[in-house]
Design a protein with these regions (language model features):
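Hot-dog-fold acyl-thioester-processing enzymes
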Residues: 1-50, 107-136
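Short, well-ordered turn and helix-capping elements at secondary-structure junctions
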Residues: 10-14, 51-58, 88-90
Length: 136
């Protein structure tokens, strides 16, 4: 189930020398949105261990509104896979378009940074779709 994880406006300080948003800025927002999705289901630490290919379909400009939706699609022994979609709303036309998608993988870790089983850090009362992923 896709959920809104992050939404905001682009400001001049977010732009590269070409006048559009710096790609690394978008990736960092995607990582933050993914971490929010992860924190919704676990009570511990998790770290990003993999990001799939990211292809940008169009630039994002100053004043545009970005929307990042996430969906947890797979739960492993210690890993969580999240699909991430970035949409942009043009601040002039208010037209919404998809900018990029990617898949992020997080691993739950202990205080030393070693992976630990998800079962040991899952929050109570998980959404039904997460419960279904646990039984796969």
């Amino acid at each position: 189930m896709k959920e809104l994880s992050l939404k905001g406006r682009v400001f001049p300080s977010d732009l590269n020398h070409n006048g559009s948003v710096f790609g690394g800025w978008i990736m960092s927002k995607m990582d933050k949105a993914s971490s929010i999705a992860v924190e919704n289901i676990i009570r511990g630490k998790a770290v990003t261990v993999h990001v799939s290919e990211i292809n940008f379909k169009q630039p994002i400009y100053n004043g545009d509104i970005f929307i990042i939706n996430t969906e947890i699609t797979k739960l492993g022994t210690s890993s969580i896979t999240i699909d991430v979609d970035v949409l942009v709303i043009n601040h002039i036309t208010y037209e919404e378009t998809e900018v990029t998608t990617a898949q992020f993988k997080f691993v739950s870790v202990d205080e030393r940074g070693s992976s630990i089983p998800l079962e040991s850090v899952l929050r109570p009362n998980l959404p039904e779709y997460i419960e279904k992923l646990l039984t796969k």
